């Protein structure tokens, strides 16, 4: 702002920039408080100054959607440009900078030496996210939930992508939610997922969806007319969104399919130790999205259930739904059972 307000300072800078041996100048705008309301004006002013060799825009992201605007700034660049989002929502802008032609990104030597909120370490950027392998064609995946910083999914999936030679990167994607405002949480989830899917160059190809958005994923799938696997439709909870590229080009609408793999994984684990659901009495501890999906899958496989939960009402509601939809015996009365599953 001082530079913009002082003609004298601008004159000194321009005179210096005209020298044959003058280094290039980086014109930078930082806002640690959030997206500046005059972002377009700031960017236009920097672009109009011939003394600027490199432009840099950085601000604290309010949501994942702020990354998309920064990607557009990179795509519209008229000279080398750095566009980064700070904070917990901004990692995508840092990792995906080479996908959109960013001049550079920043990383710290250690977690203790970060110079901006949300900055990854070099080990995370180069090792976990394989920064040097990211290019325009890299497909983007992520784990969506609130919170997701603790998730090991990026470590597992990125290692898998490297092992099979897949040009993809898997990121933590926090989407804010509030238990006391479910409709607002759904609106946040819907707006974020659709905006990422519709971005013409992001190439979002899939999401693992975790708490508290598993029910929101099913609700969104029904609204959008996406393919919904039978178990997700039955239990009202899903954890996987697979997105197909459009045959009509990147800007066309894209098809999607929604699945629940929680239940299949649990049943396969039981089968792996010789336990089959048919005729089994199962004590199910938990009544959330994962527990519900597993309960439905076991009931469909012929098991009977006793459901335990801190909330008696939640346990009763899940038991009633399973009994009504599958015809299996599901209750919350204590009884002898052969297998107990504690679903945290």
Locate each region found by the language model.
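Short acidic low-complexity segments
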Residues: 326-344
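Glycine-rich beta-alpha junction loops
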Residues: 31-32, 61-63, 85-91, 110-113, ...
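NAD(P)-binding Rossmann-fold cofactor-contacting core
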Residues: 303-326
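Short, solvent-exposed amphipathic alpha-helices that sit
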Residues: 42, 152-163, 289, 293, ...
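A structural signal for isolated positions on well-ordered beta-strands in alpha/beta enzyme cores
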Residues: 26, 56, 82, 142, ...
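Phosphate/diphosphate ligand-binding glycine-rich loop within oxidoreductases
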Residues: 138-275
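Catalytic alpha/beta core domains of metabolic enzymes, predominantly
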Residues: 4-139
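Glycine-rich adenosine-cofactor-binding loop
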Residues: 85, 140-149, 258-263, 270-302, ...
């Amino acid at each position: 702002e001082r530079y913009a307000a002082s003609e004298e300072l601008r004159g000194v800078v321009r005179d210096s920039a005209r020298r044959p041996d003058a280094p290039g100048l980086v014109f930078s705008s930082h806002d640690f408080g959030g997206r500046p309301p005059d972002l377009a004006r700031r960017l236009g002013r920097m672009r109009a100054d011939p003394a600027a060799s490199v432009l840099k825009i950085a601000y604290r992201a309010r949501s994942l959607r702020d990354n998309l605007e920064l990607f557009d700034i990179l795509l519209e660049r008229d000279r080398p440009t750095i566009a980064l989002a700070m904070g917990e929502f901004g990692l995508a802008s840092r990792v995906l900078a080479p996908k959109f032609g960013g001049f550079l990104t920043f990383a710290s030597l250690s977690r203790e030496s970060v110079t901006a909120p949300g900055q990854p370490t070099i080990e995370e950027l180069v090792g976990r996210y394989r920064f040097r392998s990211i290019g325009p064609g890299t497909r983007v995946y992520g784990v969506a939930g609130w919170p997701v910083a603790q998730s090991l999914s990026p470590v597992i999936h990125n290692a898998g992508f490297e092992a099979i030679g897949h040009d993809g990167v898997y990121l933590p994607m926090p989407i804010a939610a509030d238990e006391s405002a479910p409709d607002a949480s759904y609106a946040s989830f819907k707006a974020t997922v659709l905006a990422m899917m519709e971005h013409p160059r992001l190439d979002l190809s899939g999401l693992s969806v975790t708490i508290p958005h598993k029910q929101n994923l099913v609700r969104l799938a029904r609204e959008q007319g996406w393919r919904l696997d039978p178990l997700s439709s039955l239990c009202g909870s899903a954890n996987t969104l697979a997105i197909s590229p459009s045959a009509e080009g990147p800007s066309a609408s894209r098809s999607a399919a929604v699945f629940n793999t929680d239940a299949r994984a649990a049943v396969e684990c039981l089968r792996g130790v010789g336990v089959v659901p048919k005729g089994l009495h199962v004590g199910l501890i938990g009544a959330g999205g994962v527990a519900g999906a597993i309960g439905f899958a076991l009931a469909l496989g012929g098991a009977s259930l006793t459901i335990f939960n801190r909330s008696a009402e939640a346990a009763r509601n899940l038991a009633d739904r399973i009994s009504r939809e599958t015809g299996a015996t599901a209750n919350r009365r204590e009884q002898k059972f052969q297998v107990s599953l504690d679903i945290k």
